[in-house]
Amino acid sequence: AKINSGGESSGAVHFMELFDRVAAVVSQGNVRRGSFAAYLPIEHPDVKEFLRIRSEGNAIQEMSFAVTVTDSWMRGMIDGDQDKKDLWASVIKKRYETGYPYIFFQDNANNQAPDCYKDQGMKIYASNLCNEISLPSKEDESFVCCLSSLNLIQWDEIVKTDAIETLTMFLDAVMEEYIQKTEHIPFMEASHNFAKRHRAIGMGVLGWHSYLQSNMISFESMEAKLLNSSIFKKIRKSSDKATEELANLLGEPLYCQGYGRRNTTTLAIAPTTSSSFILGQASPSIEPLNGNYFTKDLAKGKFSYRNPYLKSLLEEKGKDTDDVWLSILNSGGSVQRLPFL
């Protein structure tokens, strides 16, 4: 694209190579590499080049990426705009082949944003590395969010306690520590500003599928749907109660003033790939397990996984043998071919 002052820009994707390289040389304790996600509007002139990221021979091989899609663009595609249909097909094909790009429906995020954002005209343009938070950003604010997850394997005990309220308060305390520690660090001004003015936190869950299996409830059953609704209503109600109590005790940040809240957001469903495995080999987040016997490749090593609830069932039927587990492994973790189930 041409530059007003003269010359020509190499385009958005060219500059993404810089972020990809920077992330590649950053590590957490020499174990986990840095990560970065780029979001680009689907109507951007460089989107076709963008969709070639991670392809064989492409300069960018590690970076996560996403397209942002508006309602008006989708309506045009559905109404038959051939260029939009062809581009959408390319997005879906790429996603089928690689898992990328994420698809972020921008208008959905803004329509469902907290009142404190909508009332103040604050716009959400993109999400984060794992697409679990929807927060606004602007020149002097770069969004940050403190995350944690409830282990639903323990839900029957959690619901009898104040664990949800306690976790909400804990996350707010973590945010306060971040605000204090980043106050005078160079180049952290934008994230510090966001943390101080929003105090956004995100409580999620892990072990949803494990909880269902422990109670012999089918993942797609009506019972599971009703249970899902009940659990998240409880989490929402309790987290709202906690942030309101915090506002009364400690005050409201800039963008919550007049709303009776300490935090602009309280919930977020993160993927929890590693943490769920550490916490009792629970299923990740709200997702189903992709098999009953497989090798888990995590930051700190490779670990074999045998579904503990299936193991208990096999023990009941006298079928918990190496031969049975080998047949499950050879079937990609599936038990559909086992005649006794």
Residue map of PLM features:
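Long, C-terminal-biased catalytic regions of enzyme "large/alpha" subunits
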Residues: 1-341
